[in-house]
């Protein structure tokens, strides 16, 4: 239903719950029957190896990210998963400036190059097909 609504250009807004990742997962339009919540990636030590270990993950992946590291994370995920992997970035969930952007990892990177990341982010990435 969510994927069909998005394809038809209908805005999808999930009702908030106790965690930000659930509305972001629903609004992403990506498969949510099976997913893995990764939280924040390590800042430095182990970051690349964690991302590399997820490159073959078949479930949808959910990450939290700060505005200061969003571009770095999108770039690293693009390098590890490929530029065409589908994803979404949601920010400021349940707040006045709530926004969800959907596309490939490379499209999202390009978008945020032009629009300075602000707010709290939830990044949802499709699993490996």
Describe each region flagged by the PLM.
Residues 59-60, 64-129:
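A contiguous loop/helix-start segment that scaffolds small-molecule binding in enzyme catalytic cores
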């Amino acid at each position: 239903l969510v994927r069909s609504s998005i394809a038809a250009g209908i805005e999808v807004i999930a009702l908030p719950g106790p965690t930000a990742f659930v509305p972001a997962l629903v609004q992403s339009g990506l498969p949510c029957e099976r997913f893995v919540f990764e939280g924040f990636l390590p800042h430095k030590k182990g970051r690349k190896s964690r991302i590399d270990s997820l490159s073959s993950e078949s479930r949808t992946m959910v990450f939290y990210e700060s505005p200061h590291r969003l571009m770095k994370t999108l770039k690293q995920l693009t390098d590890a998963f490929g530029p065409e992997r589908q994803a979404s970035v949601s920010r400021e969930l349940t707040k006045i400036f709530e926004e969800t952007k959907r596309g490939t990892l490379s499209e999202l990177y390009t978008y945020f190059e032009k629009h300075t990341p602000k707010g709290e982010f939830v990044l949802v990435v499709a699993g490996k097909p």
